[in-house]
Amino acid sequence: MKLTCVVIVVVLFLTACQLITADDSRRTQKHRALRSTTKLSLSTRCRIPNQKCFQHLDDCCSRKCNRFNKCV
């Protein structure tokens, strides 16, 4: 019984902490439109033009690999 009460109190405390910090973080994200595109390009490495590429991997930043296996 004691353990159940402690678990309930801890869960309520952690929930309250999350709600308090969620209020502080509202409207702090800048450049919202850029987030999805820059996040993808920063999280994956891509090859710049004239670097060696592989057509079946799509590893060029432009997603275009020519027949000489160079990024366009």
UniProtKB/Swiss-Prot annotation:
Domain of life assignment: Eukaryota
Query: What Pfam families does this protein map onto?
Result: Conotoxin
Report the outcome of residue 54 to Y: 11-fold decrease of toxicity
Q: Which residues carry this modification: 4-hydroxyproline?
A: 49
Post-translationally, this protein is described as follows, namely: This toxin is not amidated at the C-terminal Val residue.
The subcellular location is: Secreted
Q: In which tissues is it expressed?
A: Expressed by the venom duct.
Q: Which UniProt keywords apply?
A: Disulfide bond, Hydroxylation, Ion channel impairing toxin, Knottin, Neurotoxin, Pharmaceutical, Potassium channel impairing toxin, Secreted, Signal, Toxin, Voltage-gated potassium channel impairing toxin
- Asked whether the UniProt record includes Membrane among its keywords, one would answer no
Effect of substituting residue 59 to A:
Loss of toxicity
Q: What is the effect of changing residue 55 to A?
A: 3-fold decrease of toxicity
The region annotated as signal peptide is 1-22
Annotated phenotype, changing residue 69 to A = 19-fold decrease of toxicity
Known role: Kappa-conotoxins bind and inhibit voltage-gated potassium channels (Kv). This toxin inhibits the drosophila Shaker channel (IC(50)=57-80 nM). In vivo, when tested in fish, this toxin induces hyperactivity, followed by continuous contraction and extension of major fins, without immobilization or death. Injection of this peptide together with the delta-conotoxin PVIA causes the sudden tetanus of prey (STOP) syndrome, which is a single, lethal 'fin-pop' in envenomed fish. When tested in mice, induces hyperactivity.
Query: What does the record's free text say on domains?
Result: The presence of a 'disulfide through disulfide knot' structurally defines this protein as a knottin. The cysteine framework is VI/VII (C-C-CC-C-C).
What family is reported? Belongs to the conotoxin O1 superfamily.
Name of the protein described by the UniProt record: Kappa-conotoxin PVIIA
Q: Which taxonomic lineage does the organism of this UniProt entry have?
A: Eukaryota, Metazoa, Spiralia, Lophotrochozoa, Mollusca
